Amino acid sequence: LKCEWDGLVGTRGEIAKETIER
């Protein structure tokens, strides 16, 4: 989901990654 989320969000991938990781 990380890869897919990163691609879907794009620039917001970094923010989403931090939220998902936490």
Swiss-Prot record:
Keyword list, A-Z: Disulfide bond, Protease inhibitor, Serine protease inhibitor
| Coiled-coil blocks | none
Question: Which GO MF terms does the UniProt record name?
Answer: serine-type endopeptidase inhibitor activity
Entry similarity comment? Belongs to the protease inhibitor I13 (potato type I serine protease inhibitor) family.
- Provide the assembly information: Heterodimer of an A chain and a B chain, linked by a disulfide bond.
Function of the protein: Inhibitor of chymotrypsin.
Query: What is the protein named?
Result: Cytin chain B
Taxonomy, top ranks, is: Eukaryota, Metazoa, Spiralia, Lophotrochozoa, Annelida
